[in-house]
Structures are given as structure tokens and as C-alpha cells.
Amino acid sequence: MTDLVPLRRALLSVSDKTGLVPLGQALAARGVELLSTGGTAKALREAGLDVVDVSDVTGFPEMMDGRVKTLHPKVHGGLLALRDNAAHVSAMERHGIGAIDLLVVNLYPFEATVAAGADYAACIENIDIGGPAMIRAAAKNHSFVTVLTDVEDYEALLGELEAREGATGYPFRQKMALNAYARTAAYDAAVSGWMTDALAEVAPRRRAVAGTLAQTLRYGENPHQGAAFYVDGSDRPGVATAVQHQGKELSYNNINDTDAAFELVAEFAPEDGPACAIIKHANPCGVARGATLAEAYTKAFQCDQTSAFGGIIALNRPLDGPTAEAISGIFTEVVIAPGADETARAVFAAKKNLRLLTTEGLPDPKAPALTVRQVSGGYLVQDKDNGNIGWDDLKVVTKRAPSEAEIADLLFAWKVAKHVKSNAIVYVKDGATVGVGAGQMSRVDSARIAARKSADMAEALGLETPLIQGSVVASDAFFPFPDGLLTAAEAGATAVIQPGGSMRDVEVIAAADAAGLAMVFTGMRHFRH
């Protein structure tokens, strides 16, 4: 192995031809011989460059509809041969194999083909075979071969050649080899993931998780932790696909909280009215519907004004001027919405630190997806919690049935509870949260905390009666004892929604009847950890 390897011969075979011609011209200007295949060779020739077809090197034409182009010893031998190994050099001479110093390959657009909704056969045809084989060969032999798999690396190569007078150094080749192996790993992960979905495999024997670096973050949850943001290439609207119009770079916590906020607000379809969710530390501190977006924000903000400071705001409709004006009254880290009109953007222009993201759509809360969580020595995979219920799914278990207004609020509270860390208790009144208890080890403590925060907020707003009076309450899991339910009743709740299923359901139902509560069971739990 030597540090500097002059580039004399390069093989270029790319699907994405962005930057191809300038790269070819720069290499040719340095006297590098260009080998190529199919459309890549055609593009280079049309630019006036001399190109040797790989089929002329191998003595075999491209065949089987292009499935076989580069799978030949004269290609792979040129990539894999150790230049300081006498036996390898002798074999190259005997078989007329020329060394290849540079490989430039990007792969068939398999991921884009799948994303476009192509049928099974079309996806199969877009699985690259020769490309990954060459990439892996060149990467393995990075002691002597430079391999490029990303258009973004072309300029880096030209800079390296300029700095090293037409050669590449070992550190550069090693870095490009790492990029190459990461690319083939991600490509294979995409193929295996697609086939897993196509075969409806719930738990395949092996599962690969891959992503592309979107942003190197200043730090993680805390300043002493390194962090980065990777995207998986899916087109689900959200923080990964959003356009940032202003403000500082997103932090690790911003990204995590913004995702939580947007997924929550997407539970409320825009055609059913404007909705707003305010998130702090991945938990909602206010969620509401309103006649206007500004009203929805104001109602959500009134749930817990203290916690909303420095929070994340998500909207289910494009941000407008009046809503932007209302939001501007408090320090906010991020606002995410399907869009933002010019008036709203002009209002926010004065808030230099506020990050405004738009997504051109909402994520589908019913779309199948997976959630992945790392544990020591492995990771957990599960279906995304897309569980939802309607009026017809509710089972009235108390003597008093809830009114239509109570049912509307119960269903609203149930949607919110799904997005609150367990144990979750959510009080709702008139389409707005009025108390949220999250993340407590005891369900009754969550009920008490939510009630106390509502009372504190009423005092801060100068209200004689806490908003929690006449509210409904949702619990993400069953009440194991009557105490949590009775705490809610004492706070002013009139109706309850919960999964049911406790050994003490009969006792809890009796307590609800004694307190004059209406209660419905959903038969569905929404634990969130």
C-alpha cells in the first residue's frame, strides 16, 4: 500500500448524470483514460470526450437487456488487484487486465422507483447488480483505488487531485471507501425493506435500518453528547421533509419535539376545522380546535401558558397573518405547518431566532409505518400506533350515557392522549385541552397534576372557575383503582373515556355511577413510553 496513487485510468458508470460531464472533462484534462458503459459513455461522447467502451475492454457486449455489462474479470481484476503483489501483477499481465485507479458509480434509482409506486416487476429491474459489485470491489481495494458513489464527492476529488498533483492520498481513498460501503449497505437495506413489505413479513429474520445524513447537529439532548440527523428517504410530510424558511439550525431536541407536535396535530383533519398543538419535551401542553387558526392557537395556549414558553407549535392548516401575530407574543422555538402565507412570513421575519418550517401537507395518521427504539444489544420494532376510534366504537358502561357534546370532547381527548407519555391523563372542554398529566408512574398522580395545573392556569387568567369544571377526561390505559377516576370527578370532570379491561372494572364503574359520571370504554390502549 502506498499513500499517493496517481489516477491514470477511470471507469464511470452512473444513473444520475448530474456533474458527470464536468468531472469527465476535468479527468480528461489530466490525461486520465475514461472507460464507460451505455448512457454514461454516450453523455461523455456528446460532450466531446474520448471514451473506451467497457465492452471493448472485456471483449463481451452488453447483454440481457443491460443486466450484464461489467461483471467480468477484466473489470473486477482491474479493481481488486494489489499493485504491490507480484503474483497479482503477473496475473494482470498474463490476462491483459489493466489497472483501474478510479471508479465512479451511482446506482439504479431503486428507492425512487419504489417511492413512485412502480409495480413489482419494475422495482426488480431497478435493483442494481453490477454497480454494487464494482463499488464493493473498489472499496475493498481502497489501498490503490478511489471510489466515488455520490455526486457530492466530485468536487472533493478534484480538490484532492489539485492538491496532490493528479494523485489521491490514502486518507481520502479510505473516506471514500467508507462512503461506498455505507451506500451499498443502505441500498441493500432499501431492497430488503421493500421485499419485507411486499411479502408482508411482520418479523423478518434480519432487518436493516439505514439513513442518509441530513445534518450534523451541534450536540444531542445535552451539550456533552454528539448528534446527527439522518433521513430515510420516505416522503411522509414532517420535519425530515420540511423547508426551513428562517431561524437557526434545528437542534436535536427541536427535531424530536417538532416531529411529536406535527404527528399529533395531523390527528385533526383540516377539513374538520383548524387545530393547533403546542409541545414541550415531546409532550403536549396545549391542543385545541377553533373557528379560526388563531382561535385554535389561543385556546391551546391557555391550557398551560407557562409550559408553552419556548415550545414547539404545530398547525394543521397553513399559517396565516393573525395566527402569526398571536404566536409572536411569546418566545417559541419552532412553528411547523403545511404552509405559510406572505403575511405570516412577514410577521415572523422580525423574529430572527424563530424557526419556521412548512411541509406542503400533513402526515396520514392512518398510514402504516414502523417505530424503532434502540436498547442495549439490539432494537425494538413495532407498528406505529395508528389505532383510532369513532362514535360507533364506544361502549357506554355507566348508567348515564354521555351527551353528544361530551362524546365530541371525549374523542378529542382520546386523540390527544395517544400522544402523551404514559401514564397519561387529558382533560378537555369545548375542543381544547384544559389539563394534561404526563409521564407519571401513578395514574392518580397524573390526574392530580393535570387538575392542579388547570387550577393554577385559571388563577393566572383571573378566572373564577377553573376551565376543568365541566370537562371530560381521557386515560391512555385503564384505571386500576377508582382513585384516579374519583380525582378527575372531584376536579370537575363529567365524563370519562378509557380502554377498560381492569380486574376492577366493576368497582371503577360503580364509583363512576356513584359520582354521576358518564363513562365509555374503547377496548384500545395507548401506552407511550
Curated annotation (Swiss-Prot):
It catalyses: (6R)-10-formyltetrahydrofolate + 5-amino-1-(5-phospho-beta-D-ribosyl)imidazole-4-carboxamide = 5-formamido-1-(5-phospho-D-ribosyl)imidazole-4-carboxamide + (6S)-5,6,7,8-tetrahydrofolate; IMP + H2O = 5-formamido-1-(5-phospho-D-ribosyl)imidazole-4-carboxamide. It comes from the Bacteria. Pfam families: AICARFT_IMPCHas, MGS. InterPro entries: AICAR_Tfase_dup_dom_sf, Cytidine_deaminase-like, MGS-like_dom, MGS-like_dom_sf, PurH-like. GO terms for molecular function: IMP cyclohydrolase activity; phosphoribosylaminoimidazolecarboxamide formyltransferase activity. The keyword Hydrolase applies. GO terms for cellular component: cytosol. Transmembrane segments: none annotated. Keywords: Hydrolase, Multifunctional enzyme, Purine biosynthesis, Transferase. Its EC number is 2.1.2.3, 3.5.4.10. Pathway: Purine metabolism; IMP biosynthesis via de novo pathway; 5-formamido-1-(5-phospho-D-ribosyl)imidazole-4-carboxamide from 5-amino-1-(5-phospho-D-ribosyl)imidazole-4-carboxamide (10-formyl THF route): step 1/1; Purine metabolism; IMP biosynthesis via de novo pathway; IMP from 5-formamido-1-(5-phospho-D-ribosyl)imidazole-4-carboxamide: step 1/1. GO terms for biological process: 'de novo' IMP biosynthetic process. Residues 2-149 form the MGS-like domain. The IMP cyclohydrolase activity resides in the N-terminal region. PANTHER family: BIFUNCTIONAL PURINE BIOSYNTHESIS PROTEIN ATIC, BIFUNCTIONAL PURINE BIOSYNTHESIS PROTEIN PURH. Belongs to the PurH family. This is Bifunctional purine biosynthesis protein PurH. It comes from Dinoroseobacter shibae (strain DSM 16493 / NCIMB 14021 / DFL 12).
